Amino acid sequence: MSGDFDLPSPYVHRVAAADFDVDAYGHVNNSVYLRWLDEAAWAHSSALGVTPQHCVGVRRGMVVWRSQLHYLAPAFAGDALEVGTWLVFSDGRLRVDRRFQLRRAGDRRTLLRALIHYVCADLDSGRPKRMPADYAARYAPLAEVVNALADDRNRGFAPGVEPREPRAISRGATARDDAGDPR
């Protein structure tokens, strides 16, 4: 993997894999990666002025609607890691999307890529609610990120964090029937 992050101008949050992050398989448990992404999202949001205290004050918060994570390589206890995150979409009303790239700081190997979709919710009811105007302004993606994403699409590059939906094997079909389908 390249030593560069996938997109320009990432917000970089640094984490270290601890002994208690390691599971019975001897590597960092996949649920820990999700915790690190959440920490990075909060750190980035706070840097943009959308702190937890601000969210509580206006009774609105961005909550996870859907997560797509591609685990590419394991992390181990003692690894110094960098979580790059970017705002890649905002409709200015309800939805914000973030991309993430987790890499080992030493060799810059990418361990995970993710796309997480958020919706703005009323903190009292938990129901979707239009985001405040300041959220819309603060969560707007950077122009250079939008341009890089457009360049990727123009070259026919799919970002690669959205795995193809697994196809269910229909009743009576065998795995071989499905595996041979070029879909």
Regions found by a protein language model. Name each.
Residues 33-56:
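Active-site helix/loop of acyl-thioester processing domains in fatty-acid/polyketide metabolism
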Residues 59-74:
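Small beta-barrel nucleic-acid-binding modules, principally OB-folds
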Residues 1-13, 71-80, 88-183:
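HotDog/MaoC-like acyl-thioester-processing domains
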